[in-house]
């Protein structure tokens, strides 16, 4: 805290007015001290509110993050959480997905909070995903115009998500205020709703610092914010099954199931001089899955129906989706997995598909 400003020399007051002069000077000094201290205290409160014993100081805090109006609140992600590998992976996966969707628009997003806050990119993203056209101005520079565009875009998002029970954990002010947590909640919900061909890391949780200004002072608190749970829960499509239990509570039994499935698939793929040692990776492109179904049902799959040597994500998804169609044709139920999950090396999804085949064809020679 800075000291009080030096006082200029003043003539000695007559003795009879000593008390009055002393109190007057003291009052002036205290007033100057108070004013200086208020400025310094506000800066120090901002620093101490953001820093906490459980986390290092935020070195990239913007000045505006500690300049709040009375009763105003601002949130920011704890720096430790920003460095968490799963958080970084979530941000990267979402960035890559957005850029892939908007590739034809020649839009490249480099930083979520800086590139999405004004509604321009969100508008284009929603129009692409929902195959619609929003009635908004193409370019808006003013804050009012940006918020009006955001309002229109978020209302369209709400119309899509709310009927399906998605919690809306964002609003115009949080998105326009570059609140990364709110932006991530929005993007995760969109990715799940539109079944994006991506694999979001599960159980991503961040610590959020909430700073509020009350009676001229800044107060902070930490809250835990869950950004993702599991794919099944976020999709809201599947009930827990035996594989959830195996993965969560019985890894030893899970290994036995994997060995049994490897034995089962090799029993048939060996007829084509093919052998599987890793279920997670060797079924990811869909080729072995298609060939296995042909062997199990004793038919030849025309090569023009699938990609024998797929070299892109879309071709692999096509192969797995085609295999799912063959399963339906064979009288099996639709697998409790998405083709994208199998392609993205989600072991649980791959095991579910193979176990479905095992239960029907385990006695086939």
Swiss-Prot record:
<dbReference type="GO" id="GO:0005925">
    <property type="term" value="C:focal adhesion"/>
</dbReference>
<dbReference type="InterPro" id="IPR028433">
    <property type="entry name" value="Parvin"/>
</dbReference>
<feature type="compositionally biased region" description="Pro residues">
    <location>
        <begin position="1"/>
        <end position="12"/>
    </location>
</feature>
<dbReference type="GO" id="GO:0030031">
    <property type="term" value="P:cell projection assembly"/>
</dbReference>
<feature type="domain" description="Calponin-homology (CH) 1">
    <location>
        <begin position="88"/>
        <end position="195"/>
    </location>
</feature>
<keyword id="KW-0009">Actin-binding</keyword>
<dbReference type="GO" id="GO:0071963">
    <property type="term" value="P:establishment or maintenance of cell polarity regulating cell shape"/>
</dbReference>
<feature type="compositionally biased region" description="Basic and acidic residues">
    <location>
        <begin position="37"/>
        <end position="47"/>
    </location>
</feature>
<dbReference type="GO" id="GO:0030032">
    <property type="term" value="P:lamellipodium assembly"/>
</dbReference>
<dbReference type="Pfam" id="PF00307">
    <property type="entry name" value="CH"/>
</dbReference>
<keyword id="KW-0472">Membrane</keyword>
<dbReference type="GO" id="GO:0030036">
    <property type="term" value="P:actin cytoskeleton organization"/>
</dbReference>
<keyword id="KW-1003">Cell membrane</keyword>
<dbReference type="GO" id="GO:0005886">
    <property type="term" value="C:plasma membrane"/>
</dbReference>
<comment type="similarity">
    <text>Belongs to the parvin family.</text>
</comment>
<dbReference type="InterPro" id="IPR036872">
    <property type="entry name" value="CH_dom_sf"/>
</dbReference>
<keyword id="KW-0966">Cell projection</keyword>
<keyword id="KW-0965">Cell junction</keyword>
<keyword id="KW-0597">Phosphoprotein</keyword>
<dbReference type="GO" id="GO:0003779">
    <property type="term" value="F:actin binding"/>
</dbReference>
<protein>
    <recommendedName>
        <fullName>Beta-parvin</fullName>
    </recommendedName>
</protein>
<dbReference type="InterPro" id="IPR001715">
    <property type="entry name" value="CH_dom"/>
</dbReference>
<feature type="domain" description="Calponin-homology (CH) 2">
    <location>
        <begin position="255"/>
        <end position="362"/>
    </location>
</feature>
<keyword id="KW-0130">Cell adhesion</keyword>
<keyword id="KW-0963">Cytoplasm</keyword>
<feature type="modified residue" description="Phosphoserine">
    <location>
        <position position="8"/>
    </location>
</feature>
<comment type="function">
    <text>Adapter protein that plays a role in integrin signaling via ILK and in activation of the GTPases CDC42 and RAC1 by guanine exchange factors, such as ARHGEF6. Is involved in the reorganization of the actin cytoskeleton and formation of lamellipodia. Plays a role in cell adhesion, cell spreading, establishment or maintenance of cell polarity, and cell migration.</text>
</comment>
<feature type="region of interest" description="Disordered">
    <location>
        <begin position="1"/>
        <end position="52"/>
    </location>
</feature>
<comment type="subunit">
    <text>Interacts with ILK, ARHGEF6, PXN (via LD motifs), ACTN2 and actin. Interacts with DYSF.</text>
</comment>
<dbReference type="GO" id="GO:0007155">
    <property type="term" value="P:cell adhesion"/>
</dbReference>
<dbReference type="GO" id="GO:0015629">
    <property type="term" value="C:actin cytoskeleton"/>
</dbReference>
<keyword id="KW-0206">Cytoskeleton</keyword>
<dbReference type="GO" id="GO:0030018">
    <property type="term" value="C:Z disc"/>
</dbReference>
<dbReference type="GO" id="GO:0030027">
    <property type="term" value="C:lamellipodium"/>
</dbReference>
<keyword id="KW-0677">Repeat</keyword>
């Amino acid at each position: 805290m800075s000291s009080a400003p030096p006082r200029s020399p003043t003539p000695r007051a007559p003795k009879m007015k000593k008390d009055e002069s002393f109190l007057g000077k003291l009052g002036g000094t205290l007033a100057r001290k108070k004013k200086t201290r208020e400025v310094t205290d506000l800066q120090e409160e901002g620093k101490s509110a953001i820093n906490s014993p459980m986390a290092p100081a935020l070195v990239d805090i913007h000045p505006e993050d500690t300049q709040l109006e009375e009763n105003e609140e601002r949130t920011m992600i704890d720096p430790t959480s920003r460095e968490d590998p799963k958080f970084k992976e979530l941000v990267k996966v979402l960035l890559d997905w957005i850029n892939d969707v908007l590739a034809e628009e020649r839009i490249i997003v480099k930083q979520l909070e800086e590139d999405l806050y004004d509604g321009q990119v969100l508008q284009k993203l929603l129009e692409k995903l929902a195959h619609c056209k929003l009635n908004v101005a193409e370019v808006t520079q003013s804050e009012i115009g940006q918020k009006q565009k955001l309002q229109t875009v978020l209302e369209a998002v709400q119309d899509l998500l709310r009927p399906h029970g998605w919690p809306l954990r964002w609003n115009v002010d949080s998105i326009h205020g570059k609140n990364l947590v709110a932006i991530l909640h929005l993007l995760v919900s969109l990715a799940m709703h539109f079944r994006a061909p991506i694999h979001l890391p599960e159980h991503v949780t961040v610590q959020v610092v909430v700073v509020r200004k009350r009676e001229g002072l800044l107060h902070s608190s930490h809250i835990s914010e869950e950004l993702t749970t599991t794919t099944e829960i976020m999709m809201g499509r599947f009930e827990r099954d035996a594989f959830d239990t195996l993965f969560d509570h019985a890894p030893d039994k899970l290994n036995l199931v994997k060995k049994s499935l490897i034995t089962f698939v090799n029993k048939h793929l060996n007829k084509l001089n093919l052998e599987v040692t890793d279920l997670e990776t060797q079924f990811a492109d869909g080729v072995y899955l298609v060939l296995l179904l042909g062997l199990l049902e004793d038919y030849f799959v025309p090569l023009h129906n699938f990609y024998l040597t797929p070299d892109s994500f879309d071709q692999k998804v096509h192969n797995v989706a085609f295999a799912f169609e063959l399963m339906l044709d064979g009288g099996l139920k639709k697998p409790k997995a998405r083709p994208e999950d199998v392609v993205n090396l989600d072991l649980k999804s791959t095991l579910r598909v193979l176990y479905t085949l095992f239960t029907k064809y385990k006695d086939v020679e």
